[in-house]
Amino acid sequence: MKLKVPPILLLLPALMLLVLVSCGGASQVADTPIQKVQAVGKPAETQRHDKVFSRYPCTEDGTKPFTSPFFPTDLITEILPMGKVSATSGHVTPTDHLYVHRDVPAGADIEYVLAPADGAIVHIQRFNQDKLLDRENQSSPMVPDYRLIFMHSCTFFTIFIHLGELAPAVAEKTGEIPFGDSWLSNKSVPIQVKAGEPIAKFGQLGNDWSVHDANSTLAGFVVPEHYDGWEPWKIHTVDPFQFYDEPLKSDLLSKVVRKVEPRAGKIDYDVEGTIAGNWFMEGTVDYSGNVDPGAPRYWNGHLSIAYGYIDPSQVRIAIGFDTGIDDDLYCRVCNGAYGVRGNEPDPMTVGPESRLVKYELMSRRDEGFEHAIREQLGTTSLGTFLV
């Protein structure tokens, strides 16, 4: 993000001073560039590639209506909106996906995640290890952990993360995918799937879901080029519920814990001339952190000054590097994302003319299991953030 004076992309001492006084003392893996190959059966002169990743051969543009639930709605317990921040999981900047939760299956795990619309599976990535179906139960069975990219058109994609066992028709075409490896349609043939057909088991008790439209670019990323090459889909993230008709749309929205618009959440908070939005530490270049794809903690140089993903009245400051604040002792639910005393001043009102502005970082409420409660301010002062 860029300020008029100076660029907000960088954490410059002249603009920002971070002072953290301690009271006591997981990520989405991005696609890596691969060589483009000619579409099967297509002459080179007519070959087209998608407009999000610039890698997958395709033939048509445009969105498609979602005619199938991606999972039985009666088995979905809740949907968390986009925009959550957690330095512990690598999401210092607001997440571009929703979190879909279910209960532990009663009996055999037989339900599959389904294609919401016609399209083709073009990329499946297997993470480095299998996971417990129920991470709270050490005797729970292990399930695979996949990230899957589903292309509906040259401009329209659905992405699922943390899916389980692949559907038989899909696994037959991919073969065994080793840990830490990927199946790519560029090196094979895209797997065509019709709306309502199975893709994979749900996986654990929560997975990630996002939809991206190359013809839509979020206005709240004032320098969209900073995401190119690392997470190019991010600036094209859209509300997935808009593609469903009733009654399915309302069925899904009834599971969403955010009750204010936009119900699907918000991820783009950059406002030029203010401190609001995503920041990248000087020398880290952009979202990539100036490290190789797959390198650990690329988000160390990330900072976001935004708002609560469930309750946008809550100011939220998320910091990628180790601040010295002991979250385990003082704020177990913070994970590097802190509240602000009084939720003021509003970051959208703070700019170069504001001089030195003090934010008192606060804990968040750590009680019960409701996400909305954990988004509210706690009572412990954790440090001082000076802008």
Language-model features, listed with the residues they occupy:
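Surface-exposed intrinsically disordered loops and tails
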Residues: 62-64, 85-88, 103, 134, ...
